[in-house]
Amino acid sequence: TFLEQGWTHCPLVEATITGSEEPEKFVLLHGHIDSWHVGIGDNATGNAAMLEIARILWENRADLKRTVRIAWWPGHSTGRYAGSTWYADTFAIDIAENCIAHINCDSPGCRWATSYHDVSTMTEAVAMLGKAIADVTGQQFQPERPLRAGDISFNNLGVTTFLMLSSTMPEELRQEKGYY
């Protein structure tokens, strides 16, 4: 193993799909592009999901009322959320005035992650998110207050957030497998 220390420039990839009625207003969908080691679950699954969401939204862009920004943060694992923190600092006024929600896409669809007992969301999104999870999975979810982690760098700007944590392994299965 080789450990490189020091400052480095990391690209922050962002796709913007402009809405037709209120293009200045936007939803920010984000995940992280860096990872420790292979990173299939954390966060190749999220990156693949965001690419597919971008493709579908682009195909249906004429129907979008508001803009969607999709960002892939560098420095999540290796910089303790440096990319999203930089973005929040750099675009704070725009985010505070125009971002209507931000959705984290970190490690969705991982193997055995079939439980929704620890879903991070702000209070104002509980009803909408609960309905979406029930409609898709048939499960009730247990909302939890978002932690100060996982690229949730926008809380101090007053933006609604959800899915810092989404599906996870059922507790019994984690114990059976000896996972923390």
Feature locations, PLM:
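Active/binding-pocket-proximal capping segment
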Residues: H32-I33, G46-A48, V68, M169-E172, ...
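Acidic/histidine-enriched alpha-helical segments
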Residues: D63-A71, H102-C105
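Hydrophobic, well-ordered secondary-structure elements that form the walls
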Residues: M50, I70, F154
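Metal-dependent peptidase/peptidase-like ectodomains
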Residues: T1, E22-E24, P74-Y180
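Short glycine-centered, acidic/aromatic-flanked micro-motifs in structured strand/loop junctions
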Residues: G31, W72-P74
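Short amphipathic alpha-helical face segments that pack within enzyme cores
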Residues: A44-E52, A82, W86
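Alpha-helix N-cap/helix-initiation motif
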Residues: W36-G46, D118, P143
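Soluble metallo-hydrolase cores and metallopeptidase-like ectodomains found primarily
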Residues: T1-G41, L51-T67
